[in-house]
From Swiss-Prot:
The name this protein goes by in its record: Acetyl-coenzyme A carboxylase carboxyl transferase subunit alpha
Top-level class of the enzyme under EC nomenclature: transferase
Species: Sinorhizobium medicae (strain WSM419)
UniProt key word Lipoprotein: no
BP GO annotations: fatty acid biosynthetic process; malonyl-CoA biosynthetic process
Amino acid sequence: MHNYLDFEKPISDLEGKILELKKLASEDESVNTSDEIARLEGRVRDAMVEIYSKLSPWQKTQVARHPSRPHFLDYASRLFTEFTPLAGDRNFANDDAIQAGLARFRGAPVAVIGQEKGNDTKSRIKHNFGSPRPEGYRKATRIMEMADRFGLPLITLVDTAGAYPGVNAEERGQAEAIARSTEMCLNVKVPIVTVVIGEGGSGGAIAIATGNRVYMLEHAIYSVISPEGAASILWRDSTRAKEAASNMKITAEDLKSLGVIDGIIPEPIGGGHRDPDAVISRTEAVIGDALKELSARSGDELRSDRRQKYLNIGRNL
């Protein structure tokens, strides 16, 4: 059963009729509903094309947060072989909001880092809804340093509403951990390819996202603050999130035009949650092409280009 978003009501109604016809046909073999089902399925495709071709920034935010959207572990299981998670920050604890480790991508060894939100109540609590604590960022820093030491390309998959803002996280140095992770991300001499697969929220995202190549899925978002947070600050009214989203330049199209990202990965009609295998396959192709291009550059060139890329963003926006 699909989790329909509020703007998907025409799709929901049509697919509901299809289910009713299929149920009728299963209960009475003398009833032939195949032609009507085919007609309705065509209308569903047309409705999805029409709706998803003109999504507003707030609607894209809803798609980016869709509970059935593939998350880091879904990508890891399909993109990589021999994925070996590494745990702990060697300082305080392990944070399951950040998943990191070593793997093979198309047979070649790589290091992998990403945020995991979870897909049910138990796993969401385990992964803190994808909001990392300081331990997660220190773990990420450790994996980056390991990748640099062994010359492993680094692939990062971003999907977080932001770093965890709890008192305990602040007491353990959340800001410092994010800054150190960002610094390490900028300093390593290996290729870094980043894909924003869902939400890219604030410093919690940028800490693992300062890549040589940064891509976004078509319906992902990337911003310095959530629309709700921006609305609360600007108007002291979080219910104006829709209005905030429209003014924040958070979509892949906006960020590509501003030069913040390098490319957009198209999603299947109806969003990545409709066809996870297709969107992950497209992501694999983009990552593969980027790594092939970057592999020809020296470590010093990779680091210099990466640092200049982000200095230019700061100067020009």
